[in-house]
Amino acid sequence: MMAVLGNAKHPEYGSATVPLPIPNDEYGHVMELLGTLGIGDVMERDCKVEEIRGGLPILKRLEKVAVNIDELDYLAKRLDSFDYIEAAQFQAMAVKTGIFDMKGLINLTFCCQQATVITDFSDLEAIGRHHLVSINGGCLSSELADTDLRMTALKLILSKDGTVTPYGVVYDNGLKLEAVYDGRHLPGYHYEQDMLAVGISSQTDSENSSKITWLYLPCSQAQVERGMMRSGISDPEEKETFDDVKARRIALELAQARLESCGAGEYETQRGAV
């Protein structure tokens, strides 16, 4: 997926075409490119989406809207991992709930799987199976075998609780949108395999604070610095600990390599306060 981004206040600056998700090794370059256009702030939604190329059709609603680049990148990563069922659930629920803002769309990625979306009414057993999996968060094969899936589907369809959308008839099943993303601290999420995660927070926050910004190692200096700013780390003394972050990154990478050589699998640091 590609996004064409510009500066709404200064359209004469031109635009930049950004790949989404942003490849790790291109992150710093992308931020520099956006900086030449006077956009790409850590927190501000200052990137006007001129065009979305590829990706889910629902994302076209972001065109002509101002977004934050890191939020857009995070949303793209979340959606990139969706299968076709989750894609239908996300898009149908976005239409049903009328969600347009980036915070809402990100939060929707964490709960849209609870909805049931019917795109083909010809296979009642498949509908019944999908509905049971959606409302239960999964089902054992034995449970599915003991259930009349056709009757389950018919009850759902005859309930008339569905909402017709361009992506199918959606049943929300009582889904409630929760604020997993608070608008500042992007929730931890392993987009790629074999990554290390380090949570950073300001020294002024309590030990059990939920105000954590996650860094996925190895990452660029730009990602670390922007992560620190997103986490609210602005005190000069705290910024000096940037060297400690780099040292921790090296230590964690060595630990990962050691564990992999022993076949121990993935290693993750749950939280590290800066």
Model-derived features with residue positions:
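Mixed-charge (acidic/basic) macromolecular-recognition segments
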Residues: 28-147, 151, 171-195, 207-274
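Elongated, non-catalytic scaffold/linker segments and compositionally distinctive motifs
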Residues: 150-158
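Short, surface-exposed polybasic-aromatic patches that bind anionic ligands, especially phosphate groups
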Residues: 164
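Short, extreme N-terminal segment that most often corresponds to the first beta-strand
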Residues: 1-26, 190-221
